[in-house]
Amino acid sequence: MHPQQLVVSWFSLVLLASPIVAIWELEKNVYIVELDWYPDAPGETVVLTCDTPEEDGITWTSDQSSEVLGSGKTLTIQVKEFGDAGQYTCHKGGEALSRSLLLLHKKEDGIWSTDILKDQKEPKAKSFLKCEAKDYSGHFTCWWLTAISTDLKFSVKSSRGSSDPRGVTCGAASLSAEKVSVDHREYNKYTVECQEGSTCPAAEESLLIEVVVEAVHKLKYENYTSSFFIRDIIKPDPPKNLQLRPLKNSRQVEVSWEYPDTWSTPHSYFSLTFCVQVQGKNKREKKLFMDQTSAKVTCHKDANVRVQARDRYYSSFWSEWASVSCS
């Protein structure tokens, strides 16, 4: 490639269609074409422009076809289906000047496609993302499920309110080692850790946190959104250091525990309430609810005492159980 070609070897796209049509840049040289998806849909006209001072000798190719698609500084294509998406390249003198990738975002009957992630249907239908926080520090974890294993890419972004300057930082999505089984089918689980940039744990929340997961599978683009207050996704870790102490002249024992290390402090302000239950092989005793960190229970041989926690003043999720053996 000649030096003068390097200076201006970049690629631009112009969409020639009605005002409601959208084409936008997902990342450098990756563009999303939004399509209404129905039989005999006309598709969208996209004009690709290769920016170079030369007027002649430019050809166009696509990774979807081995043929030369056209010549000249521009190439007009009609994008109707996935066969029209993919990577387009403009060439001159045997050298590639630039490449750009077109991905499709489908809309059927006014609804964007949600084919990549599994609907977990809890706490309501169309719940593709689940998020939890162990405390009020502004740190939270989100996860999602998919049956797809290959040609898959995720990116995550988050913010609190549309104009909040602090923002929320999310790391890269990671694939969990273990599969998740739902309705006799196995799914891959992806998780991401997020942290609010500046937070006051004791402050009343007025703006929702929004998490957006962008998913690309082959040439398909989709996005998924979840909005929440931290207080609505709180799930404490289980109580720690469960211990049993026999009581003199009694068939009962005293079970005691401590707040989890991950819970917000001071505990006098960020208080937990607890649920205690004796679980035998064949039955479970009545649950006891209390604010203190000990209780008296009848502990039968071969039974377990288990304890879980949740926010005392706001109906958070219950933690997982912590347990200790009676034997």
UniProtKB/Swiss-Prot annotation:
GO terms for molecular function: cytokine activity; cytokine receptor activity. Keywords: Cytokine, Disulfide bond, Glycoprotein, Immunoglobulin domain, Secreted, Signal. SMART domains: IGc2 (SM00408). It is found in: Secreted. PROSITE patterns: FN3, HEMATOPO_REC_L_F3, IG_LIKE. One of its GO terms (cellular component) is membrane. Belongs to the IL-12B family. Cytokine that can act as a growth factor for activated T and NK cells, enhance the lytic activity of NK/lymphokine-activated killer cells, and stimulate the production of IFN-gamma by resting PBMC. This is Interleukin-12 subunit beta. It comes from Bubalus carabanensis.
